[in-house]
């Protein structure tokens, strides 16, 4: 039995965890942008946000929609073609489908707030380099596939959007942009699951090929270093007008460094937990992000509160709550 051996019959599943922990959990968490009330956000945008804050939020949201399209393509085209197992392919197609929901939802946020220049972020150097870093890793053989999958799952799904997620969600601490904040919460939950299962799939590859972890090591470290530089440049770009109330650029950089270390360990490189130096106190000032989005570390969005991973709105009327 191998991940790369084609199986024609639908069942029995050889790797059932990709159905139960991946496809099923994502299916149970289906949501749409139409469930998110935005009237309060429009009022906040027009009456309460400063010009620098509007520029910050606008630049982030415009980039999100395009990025999610690339992420969706990775799951539905690359992962599906590499692993000829129904349970893995179904999970990948479900994840890719969810990314299209993200893209539509971000587009909805953009249009609701009057942000419709979707090509603007493609002309921005710092943002474009970050975008290219997400989609530039490819592979057509086991080592190449392993490197690509690890980089994509750990860093594209598990790190690259989190600085922007945190910035947007910080407005929630000020009782602003609650619709945007709700979408960030659901998106973080989805991305956390995608990253977790992609990292699991890479570790599964390493279990079946005991040389793979070492063969991929240097390239994965190099990719993590590249990702760090891109993220820090992106953070500088976001904060070019100064720190935002409730969050500082320096703290966010430490938060990202800590996440990179955690993701390296999640891939199986347990000796790299301290590879990127960071200030613990500064990184910990972002702990509110995990608490508000439903988890307490980068891996336990579902383990701590498993009932959270079900139908997204759970019958709540968010207009009544807010």
Can you say where each PLM-predicted feature lies in the sequence?
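Non-heme di-metal
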Residues: 1-322
